[in-house]
Amino acid sequence: MTKIFIIGLPRTGTTSISVALLECGFNVAHTAFTQHAFELADVISDSPCFSDYQQLDLLFPNSKFVYLQRERSKWVPSMQRLLTKMAPHLLPKTGHFNPVLKRSFMQTFELSNAQLLTEQHLSRCYEKHQQQVELYFNGRSDLLSIDISMPGSLQTLFTFLGLDCNDNQHFPHLNQGTQVSNWKNYKHANKINSLSAGKNHRRFFDYHDLPI
């Protein structure tokens, strides 16, 4: 069962690319926290893909991966705003966010670090994630790296996925400024619920037996 995984960090355009692929007819989950959500979706973006891409690569062989880049001077302040808003809900014991999302953010951003919101810390997290992605996919043809703000980036994505695209198409610009929930407000029949329940109810994957 092959998938398309969007493994860029939050605030790099994960919502915009998710909406663009929805409009192409894909079933898309922007965040997925159950096995069934992954089974239903053709495309999965954001958490936990940006932290779990190695495990997902093993669970879904022959899938494609898209890493999203963003100019650091724009990404850092955007991420600072996001983490400021999310922080109370990411707390291990009292935060109400899904445990998979909490783990994904903790693993990537070291939420307990006293310097969490500083430019230096976030830049270091960005660089570490980028380097790890580049190292893991080195020499492989199943990873595409794009900056969705760059001209022609949508055409590059469609070519990578084997889709037709005209030169006048562009990525939608969503979640700009302080907005963080445009995905919830976007109505589309192909959206997949992040908490979709199947035969295993709302169980997530067990990574313990994977050779990582």
Annotate each predicted stretch with a short phrase.
Residues M1-L122, Q132, N138-G139, G152-L163:
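PAPS-dependent sulfotransferase catalytic domain
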Residues P48, R70, K128, I148-G152:
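Short beta->alpha linker loops
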Residues T84-P92, C125, H129-Q132, A197-L210:
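A short, terminal or domain-edge coil/loop segment
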